[in-house]
Amino acid sequence: MAQENLQKIVDSLESSRAEREELYKWFHQHPEMSMQEHETSKRIAEELEKLGLEPQNIGVTGQVAVIKNGEGPSVAFRADFDALPITENTGLDYSADPELGMMHACGHDLHTTALLGAVRALVENKDLWSGTFIAVHQPGEEGGGGARHMVDDGLAEKIAAPDVCFAQHVFNEDPAFGYVFTPGRFLTAASNWRIHIHGEGGHGSRPHLTKDPIVVAASIITKLQTIVSREVDPNEVAVVTVGSIEGGKSTNSIPYTVTLGVNTRASNDELSEYVQNAIKRIVIAECQAAGIEQEPEFEYLDSVPAVINDEDLTEQLMAQFREFFGEDQAVEIPPLSGSEDYPFIPNAWGVPSVMWGWSGFAAGSDAPGNHTDKFAPELPDALERGTQAILVAAAPWLMK
């Protein structure tokens, strides 16, 4: 009976397909940067209110709606909705205006529309399920600390903890329009820093009267690469990237300060902490070795924990997806090196969680990837598969 009711709800999506596609195109044409998604947040709230729901504004621009439908388990689902500072080059007739210099290059518009579509299907078919569904629309995933903002704004206090929490992400993955799962670690922990090295500037012809921060920075950049190659177990995953270096504007002047932009990735939170401490140790030591008296400054930007999927829950979901979509449509893949702030949400509630990926392209992994100017999940399949997945994941807990 549960699978029959699930199928009925999924079938009901057909009647709203055209409206949902138009909604997706609106989100796509109105990209907004992290924690500045005011129009997007307003539109999400309006769509939820049309369904008779009362969304709560949590976490600056975040929106949360609770659908209470009798007794039963509770399922939460999170979708993000911020864009990226990339000029769109997809050629779509619903492309974002290039003059904006922004686009939905990571599919968050698709995540949002899929969740709104699933909520609509649940509201319109309350006779087929029982329990509670929590729709968490999260801002600022792209380095804006959106999940942390929602937690700091009292998400776990304002919204009762669900039994399980889910999230998904669209990728250019194989199989085409299929789903990928990873029991255990799915995504890495990450941190971002700016490190300011304060030397003593002066004329380029008299370096002996200076403490050259550029030379020190060069030594630091080289030494940082030994953290992964000589301090981290080869069976673990860690990356240290110096993504930017800023210092000086003149060819014959030694600057007073050099700033390094540093990013780390690690397969677990403990290793992430170790790598960050190793960076500090090396930077301090190199500055001391160069005779620089002023201590370096470590400007923390943000960090996220690793996405660790509950293994039993992941196996359960894979079985559920294979039963509904077909054996070849839900595959297990190795962990990915990307990162997400999603874990802050289930961690705040203290509930088991799973995040999975789904393919938005007929070409699978040959399609343009996330964070490129040609990233454009294909309608209608990408949207339908994303919407269906939310309902299929929630079914074991909610379907009558």
Curated annotation (Swiss-Prot):
Which InterPro entries is this protein grouped with?
A: Amidohydrolase, Bact_exopeptidase_dim_dom, Peptidase_M20, Peptidase_M20_dimer
Applied relevance: The elucidation of the enzymatic mechanisms of malodor formation may lead to completely new ways to design deodorant actives. A targeted approach to block the enzymatic process offers the possibility of an efficient treatment without perturbation of the resident skin microflora. The enzyme could also be fed with alternative substrates which are designed to release a fragrance note instead of the malodor.
Required co-factors: Zn(2+)
Keywords of this entry: Hydrolase
What is the regulatory mechanism acting on its activity?
A: Partial loss of activity with the combination Mn(2+) and chelating agents. Activity is lost in presence of 0.5 mM dithiothreitol.
Q: What class does this enzyme belong to in the EC scheme?
A: hydrolase
Query: Which GO-annotated molecular functions does the record name?
Result: hydrolase activity
Enzyme Commission designation: 3.5.1.133
Task: State the reactions this protein catalyses.
Answer: an N(2)-acyl-L-glutamine + H2O = a carboxylate + L-glutamine; N(2)-[(2E)-3-methylhex-2-enoyl]-L-glutaminate + H2O = (2E)-3-methylhex-2-enoate + L-glutamine; N(2)-(3-hydroxy-3-methylhexanoyl)-L-glutaminate + H2O = 3-hydroxy-3-methylhexanoate + L-glutamine
Q: What does this protein do?
A: Hydrolyzes odorless N-alpha-acyl-L-glutamine conjugates of short- and medium-chain fatty acids, releasing human axillary malodor compounds. The enzyme is highly specific for the glutamine residue but has a low specificity for the acyl part of the substrate. The two most common products are 3-methyl-2-hexenoic acid (3M2H) and 3-hydroxy-3-methyl-hexanoic acid (HMHA), which are produced from the odorless precursors N-alpha-3-methyl-2-hexenoyl-L-glutamine (3M2H-Gln) and N-alpha-3-hydroxy-3-methylhexanoyl-L-glutamine (HMHA-Gln).
Regarding protein family, the annotation reads: Belongs to the peptidase M20 family.
Q: What is this protein called?
A: N(alpha)-acyl-glutamine aminoacylase
Q: What organism is listed for this UniProt entry?
A: Corynebacterium striatum
Q: Which lineage is the organism of this entry classified under, starting from the top rank?
A: Bacteria, Bacillati, Actinomycetota, Actinomycetes, Mycobacteriales
